[in-house]
């Protein structure tokens, strides 16, 4: 069992963090670029993304906000409750296309593509089931799941905010470093979310700046659980790696992953927003580590308590055993810091 810090201790830190929420403007979440279609189809096809205005199970598509190799993400309006939501569609585009007129998802080759398409749907459903068990203010909530157009969809809470990487870029552009109290509040809130996730025996495995949204109220919210896995399950069968944010064990087929894996990625995220640069990849760091410790960086120690920076340095140690093994360990070190 992974332990959690005592309730009074956690509540005390969270209460202090709430005194100074992370600063941000009201910039809306931008649409992501959509890659071009590839492959030759000898029958009429529609664009990969559903047209704006399409009705899906009581949700009206407003626009596409993301598109990748395994799915499409839409901003939509729920008719019944009159609220904005995010709808994720399973769409492995190397295996399927959208039929013109019906908008149904059809296989390029029904014989060779069926197994891969069913595998993608199975992973999609697994993601829904993982998310549906979670209830934390810093984790996006799942509302519903349905099947339509020969594929599957699930509906997630819409987070009206700005990604952490864009927020950090705004501060850098204005030459306004994130205040220490705001940084501390961000760290504590997200560590609490990770601790909650780990207490449910789940690993996110893809913590990075653009998977954290900051709301207008200053609340950080973790999104995109497509790489999440059960901590006690077989983690080695699926390699998900983001250079500069993923630790060594995540790039190995049988890497020993645990809470320390998400801890590294979160530390790497903090390193990025403080320095404006990504860490070298873990392969590079294993050969020759050029990452300068934050706690000895004069430009940063002039702005932040070196003890706070030292906790981030420990989180991003290349060797898993040298990192914090749990969120509780990191929080204990934070509790001893006087800002």
Model regions and ranges:
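AlphaC helix of the protein kinase catalytic domain
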Residues: 164-177
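AlphaC helix of the eukaryotic protein kinase fold
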Residues: 101-133
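Catalytic-loop of the protein kinase fold
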Residues: 198-214
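Activation-segment/catalytic-loop signature of the eukaryotic protein kinase fold
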Residues: 145
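Conserved activation segment of eukaryotic-like protein kinases, specifically the C-terminal portion
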Residues: 236-250
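Conserved short submotifs of the Hanks-type protein kinase catalytic core
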Residues: 149-163, 167
């Amino acid at each position: 069992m992974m332990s959690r810090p005592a309730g009074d201790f956690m509540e005390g830190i969270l209460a202090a963090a709430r005194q100074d929420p992370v600063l941000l403007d009201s910039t809306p979440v931008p649409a992501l670029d959509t890659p071009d279609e590839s492959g030759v189809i000898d029958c009429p096809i529609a664009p990969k993304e559903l047209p704006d205005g399409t009705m899906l199970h009581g949700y009206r598509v407003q626009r596409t906000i993301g598109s990748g190799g395994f799915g499409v993400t839409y901003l939509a309006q729920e008719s019944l409750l009159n609220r904005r939501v995010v709808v994720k569609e399973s769409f492995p585009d190397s295996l399927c296309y959208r039929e013109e007129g019906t908008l149904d998802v059809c296989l390029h080759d029904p014989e060779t593509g069926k197994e891969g398409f069913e595998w993608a749907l199975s992973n999609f459903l697994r993601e829904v089931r993982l998310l549906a068990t979670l209830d934390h203010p810093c984790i996006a909530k799942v509302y519903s799941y349905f099947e339509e157009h020969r594929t599957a969809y699930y509906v997630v809470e819409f987070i009206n905010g700005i990604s952490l990487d864009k927020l950090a870029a705004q501060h850098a552009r204005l030459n306004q470093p994130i205040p220490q109290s705001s940084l501390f509040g961000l760290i504590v809130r997200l560590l609490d979310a990770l601790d909650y996730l780990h207490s449910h025996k789940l690993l996110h495995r893809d913590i990075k700046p653009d998977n954290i949204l900051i709301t207008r109220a200053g609340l950080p919210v973790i999104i995109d659980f497509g790489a999440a896995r059960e901590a006690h399950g077989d983690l080695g069968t699926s390699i998900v790696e983001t250079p500069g944010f993923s630790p060594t064990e995540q790039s190995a087929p049988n890497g020993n992953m645990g809470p320390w894996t998400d801890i590294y990625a979160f530390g790497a995220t903090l390193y990025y927003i403080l320095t404006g640069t990504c860490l070298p990849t873990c392969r590079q760091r294993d050969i020759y580590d050029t990452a300068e410790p934050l706690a000895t960086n004069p430009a940063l120690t002039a702005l932040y308590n070196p003890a706070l920076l030292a906790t981030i340095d420990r989180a991003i140690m290349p060797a898993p055993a040298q990192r914090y093994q749990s969120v509780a360990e990191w929080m204990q070190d934070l509790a001893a810091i006087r800002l």
